[in-house]
A protein has these predicted regions:
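Active-site-proximal loop/helix segment associated with metal-binding centers of metalloenzymes
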Residues: 114-212
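Glycine-rich phosphate-binding loop signature in dinucleotide/nucleotide-binding domains
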Residues: 35-39, 168-170, 225
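Active-site neighborhood of phospho(di)ester-bond hydrolases with catalytic His/Asp-centered motifs
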Residues: 17-19, 43-48, 76-84, 102-104, ...
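Extreme N-terminal starter segment of soluble prokaryotic enzymes
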Residues: 11-16
Length: 265
């Protein structure tokens, strides 16, 4: 079986995971390449990158503005889809520049001794608001990358066939997603969620199912003896870390928060 998209970075010396960036592409590159002086580093954005709110040409211009800085620093940026991203930029028409790429769901990143599974998607708790906004429109088949503010196929998908294929060739030790298993923070249903659930009767159940997708992925990796040790995710705009009884470290990243995944010897 074909394991899907594999990203190899044999020349990288480091890995950094970023929380949501919400379209702040220039800020991310400046922060990594200039403010922190990163070099030879793979930077993985854990969703809510901001692809889809502008026309495709906008994102090409952003890349062209930043590619010189990325090249000089020998850094690469890999984006995973969040709920505030058009899935077409990841699964149907992925961006494939040398240093600037979008990762289809169930991609594997192989670098610095790690084999990293990337799975995107989440539910927008404010989806009812977005679908009633004047800027929202139903997607057109002949314009899959047209600008919009909501995408109904935002949810994550459990794909056992892809996991089976991955298991034949890889031993996953790290996973990067946008949201997280159901036992990870945040687990409260207050604030904006409670407000939005009043006008979206399916929201509570849909979010429950969304989190269970990652429960199933975790169960699959465990039952197939993958040496999972790290899980990174964003989505909740807060920072949190915990280690479970199996020794897996879960890392929730705040907006633009950066966390290093240490290279293996």
């Amino acid at each position: 079986m074909n394991p899907g998209t594999v990203f190899d970075f044999p020349d990288a010396k480091g890995i950094v995971i970023s929380g949501d960036i919400h379209g702040e592409f220039n800020k991310l590159v400046f922060k990594c390449c200039v403010q922190y002086g990163m070099t030879n580093t793979v930077i993985i954005v854990a969703g809510d990158c901001g692809f889809g709110f502008e026309q495709p040409g906008y994102y090409e211009n952003v890349y062209n503005r930043n590619r010189g800085r990325l090249s000089k620093s020998n850094n690469w940026v890999l984006f995973i889809r969040g709920n505030h991203d058009n899935p077409a930029y990841f699964n149907d028409y992925p961006i494939k520049h040398r240093r600037w790429m979008t990762a289809p769901d169930y991609s594997v990143v192989r670098t610095c001794g790690h084999e990293i599974l990337c799975v995107g998607g989440a539910i927008s708790v404010d989806r009812s608001y977005r679908m009633n906004h004047p800027a929202y429109h139903l997607p057109q088949k002949d314009q899959p990358l047209a600008r919009n503010i909501y995408w109904a196929n935002e949810y994550p998908v459990f794909d056992a066939d892809k996991l089976d294929a991955i298991s034949e060739d890889f031993a996953i030790d790290t996973i990067v997603t946008h949201t997280a298993p159901s036992f990870c923070e945040l687990t409260s249903k207050g604030g904006l969620f409670a407000e939005m659930a009043l006008c979206d009767e399916d929201l509570t159940e849909d979010v429950k199912n969304e989190r269970q997708v990652f429960d199933k992925i975790l169960d699959y990796l465990a039952s197939n003896h993958h040496p999972l040790r790290y899980w990174f995710y964003g989505h909740f705009h807060q920072s949190w870390q915990a280690i479970d009884n199996e020794g897996i470290q879960y890392n929730m990243l705040d907006i633009m928060e950066l966390k290093e995944l240490m290279a293996k010897d």
